[in-house]
Structure formats: C-alpha cells, structure tokens
Regions:
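Generic alpha-helical segment signature
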Residues: 1-2, 151
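Sec-dependent signal peptide recognition
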Residues: 2-9
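C-terminal motif of bacterial Sec signal peptides marking the signal peptidase cleavage site
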Residues: 14-16
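Bacterial signal peptide processing site
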Residues: 18-22
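Mature extracytoplasmic or organellar-lumen-exposed domains after removal of signal/transit peptides
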Residues: 23-355
Length: 355
C-alpha cells in the first residue's frame, strides 16, 4: 500500500514537471495567434465600432434636443457631443476594412471622414452646400441625405454646422451661431438630417460585423476569423496593414493641421488612435500580440514598440508636433517590420504606398 502511494506521488510530481503550466506565458503558435486575433476582434474592433455607433446616436439625439431649444447651453452640449464623436472615430478608423470599407465607390468610411479619401479638406465645399441648402427649397427628407456625396456630409459637415455660423462671416461666437440657427429654420433640418445619416452609416458597420456582411449569410466577424475575406487576403495581415495604413495617413495627409480645424480636436483624435492601438497590441492577461512576440524571442522589438507609444503620448500631452510626427512614423515602421516579423506574418505591402 505504501509503495503504491509512493509511486502515485512520484507520477504526480513528474507530470507537474512536464508540459506547460497554467501560469506559463502562451507560446507563439498558430492556435495562440488565432486566439489573439479573436480577442482583437471581440475586445478591440467590434467595441470600437459599437462605441462610435453609440456616440453617433447620442449626437443625433443631442441635435434633436438642440433644435427644440436653440440656446448657448444646448450648443455647448452639441459641440461636446461632436468632440466625443470625433474621438471615437479615430479609434475605429484604425480598422478600415470589412463593413467600413466594403465598396469601391460608396465605402462607408468616405461618408464619415471625407479627408481620408485623398487628404483633401472639403470645408469650403461643405460651407457652400450648407449655404445653398439654407436658401434652397428642396425637400430635406431622409432620401435627400442618403444621396449626398461624400464630400458634403459626415463629420466635417457636422463640425461646420456645430461650430460656426453660416454665410461669409463664419463666426465661431456662440451667440452668432445661435442667431444663425434662429434666423434659418432649414439649418436645423440640415443638422438633424446629416446627424441621422451618419448614425445610419455607423449602424451599418456594426450590423455588418455582428449580423450580416453584405450579401453573405454570415456576420463579418465569422468570415474574418474563418479567414474568408472578400479579397482573399489573410485576416491577421489585413488587420496589421489596416493599422499601418492609418498611421501612414495621419502623417502623409497632415491630419494634425487639416482635420477638425474648427473644433481644435485633432490632438484628441491622435490620442484616441494611439489608445486603440495599444489596446489592440496589449490584448488581455491571457494572450496578446506583444506577449506572443516576446514568447517568440522578440523582446527587443516589443520594447521598441512600447517605447514609441510612450513617446507619442508625451508628444500629445506636450503638444509637440515634430515629436509626434517622428514617432507616428516610427510606429508605422513597427507595423511594417517588427510586429509582422515577430508574429511571423508576411504583409506583402509596398512600403512606399500611401493612402
């Protein structure tokens, strides 16, 4: 009996000394990469899309309330809601694929952020359109706003409507904006109509990820995790390239100086983008992309990525544009080289490509 107990104890000790233990860090394997990718979708991509939709609906509700009581207090609420919407967009803009970018001509991202299309600031086009609609006679119904071209709608149009008076003066003084709305009843119809359309576009993205993507019977989440993408590319490659392209766009198109010029929210947008990228890379306590890189022997690369993100935060906090530009470019490079190399991913991109 004693010998039997001793043998059992020895076997138990030996079994505890072999294989992986519960507290061991995950190894860089295909299964763990797939698990990290699932976490990325469920804890980063879809939450970013949902948060943007939620804030779009909040902004839409605020426009209705503002137009029911046009005063400076409600204007402040309206502008604050737009600021939050803009920041949420920069979280989601890292993931410009799937439902957000599923049409060569009418991709939803173009109707949300026209600057992303080719780096053109369409503010004067938007101003002219608003002036024409205020004095026009066309029916400002749902169909009208659904048919608006990308360069006359979206976040930019809502910023112009929320932060300045129409007409040649383009005053940013709150009392002037209030007077402009009071004197031009159609302006509230323009505001609420465009807000409703943006919320509809945000909803399309969430529905595509969670319920049904285009003509497929499956949500994009399922298609993405099963590696059944529209263009035949690899899912992890698509994710990494999407983030890299957003970083490239931020510098190449001078987003810091060309975006959100009326609200002054561009720095906040950059902060939102970096917050999201860190969430994506760090994952959770079970598995993360950076953790898998460390497990694969790329600790130096991980340290470099984390240092760059920290420096970007310093640049944002101190409003150091030169430092920000330099380190956004560094992080762009990390997504081209260190991160895919550390995850054993072939990107297949031309490093000279831009947005």
């Amino acid at each position: 009996m004693r010998n039997s107990s001793l043998i059992s104890l020895c076997l138990l000790i030996l079994s505890g000394c072999s294989g992986s233990r519960p507290n061991d860090p995950p190894e860089l394997t295909v299964d763990n990469l797939n698990l990290a990718l699932q976490y990325a979708v469920d804890q980063s991509v879809i939450p970013a899309a949902t948060a943007f939709k939620t804030q779009a609906l909040t902004y839409q509700s605020v426009t209705d309330r503002f137009c029911g009581a046009v005063n400076t207090a409600e204007l402040a609420v309206l502008q604050s809601a737009w600021n939050n919407l803009y920041e949420k967009w920069f979280h989601l803009a890292n993931y410009n694929f799937g439902p957000l970018n599923d049409d060569l001509v009418f991709a939803k991202y173009t109707f949300i952020d026209s600057l992303r299309v080719r780096g053109t600031n369409y503010i004067n086009t938007v101003r002219d359109e608003i002036d024409n609609l205020i004095t026009g006679s066309e029916s400002l119904d749902e169909t009208f706003f659904e048919q608006q071209t990308f360069n006359k709608t979206g976040l930019l149009a809502l910023e112009v409507l929320s932060f300045e008076a129409s007409g040649g003066a383009q005053s940013a003084v709150a009392d002037d904006i209030i007077e402009d709305f009071a004197n031009n009843p159609r302006k509230c119809k323009i505001l609420t109509g465009m807000a409703r359309q943006l919320a509809s576009n945000a909803d399309y993205v969430v529905q595509g990820w969670q319920l049904q993507h285009k003509d497929a019977d499956l949500p994009y989440r399922t298609l993405f995790l099963d590696d059944q993408l529209d263009d035949g590319s690899n899912n992890l490659t698509q994710l990494l390239v999407s983030v890299q392209e957003h970083l490239d766009y931020l510098n190449r198109r001078n987003v810091l100086t060309t975006s959100a010029t009326l609200s002054g929210m561009a720095w906040n947008g950059f902060s939102g983008a970096i917050d999201e990228i860190e969430i994506l890379l760090e994952g959770n306590t079970e598995v993360s992309f950076l953790g898998l890189m460390e497990a694969g022997g790329f600790s130096d690369s991980v340290a470099a990525v984390r240092e760059t993100i920290t420096t970007i935060r310093t640049a944002i906090n101190t409003r150091n544009a030169e430092l920000l530009e330099t380190n956004i470019a560094k992080l762009d490079g990390h997504f081209k080289r260190e991160i895919p190399n550390g995850l054993d991913v072939e990107l297949g991109i031309n490093f000279s490509d831009g947005d």
